[in-house]
Amino acid sequence: SFVTVMTASSALAQPSLTGMAYPYQNPNLSALTRAQDLLSRLTLEEKALLMLDESPAIPRLGIKKFFWWSEALHGAANMGNVTVFPEPIAMAASFNDALLYKVFSAASDEMRAQYHHRIRNGGEDEKFHSLSVWTPNVNIFRDPRWGRGQETYGEDPYLTAVMGTAVVRGLQGPEDSKYRKLWACAKHYAVHSGPEYTRHTANLNNVSPRDLWETYLPAFKTLVEEAKVREVMCAYQALDDEPCCGNSRLLQQILRDEWGFQYLVVSDCGAVSDIWQNHKTSSDAVHATAKAALAGTDVECGFNYTYKCIPEAVQRGLISEKEVDKHVLRLLEGRFDLGEMDDPAL
């Protein structure tokens, strides 16, 4: 009948909410509510796996594998047929933040389109094909011998903050939308401006308070407070004898307590391992895991993951499962905020 046909058509037009046994599966609930519900259903071992940048699937709960590491330095990186824009140092020379917003809004459109095309055709989330983007680089290009200077927006803290804000807003999309287009990341926090070859061992203990606050931190502060950047990446090196990814002054006192950052801290790749292997401020991987997590690092990017030791760190009393839960809640809320666990039609 006509009624039957119309009912069937309506069912096809709207994503079905049937089969949603748990609150975390309901897209009509807030990201935080869903994250809290899903967190309550995870084992400690599963929580530890979710804190890796290459998070495996958890089939029993319908959690897909997820990669936190994608790049969009000057357009979607490693994604095939996409638009490539000028390097950031060249775009900074335009002094045109409105244009930069358009550039990264276009880049985020392409990344979203590529992502959904992959998923709809039976693909999976992969490294460099995800919705978490480790851009922009808002380090200060102080020394022209630094080989990654072209990634930055130059030597001026104010210009870097203005351009970085445009990048974040272009990548993440409107704050009042149901989902973020992407999650952007302010990196590398903090005082990471070369040289590259000493980045895993350097201890920057000669940075004056004035230089720290007037040169190296303003762009990060602006991106957190004004652009609402969703991720901050802690750097490899140590600052004042504490590795940045285990530095509670940087990650807790300044970033969260003073600036009000509520979202995700990710490590640079291998930075948590550096805590015990290169900086030697921890005795072993388990101690380094606890140090980084207690300081505020939510997700570890690594190769031989130190955060796999989280269950042992809890068992040894170096960190509580309640503390682990704080990190996992943030990353789960992020995944719901991206719509990664929902029907793409939403």
Where are these regions (language model features)?
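Glycoside hydrolase catalytic-domain context in secreted enzymes
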Residues: S9-L346
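Bacterial N-terminal signal peptides
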Residues: S1-A8
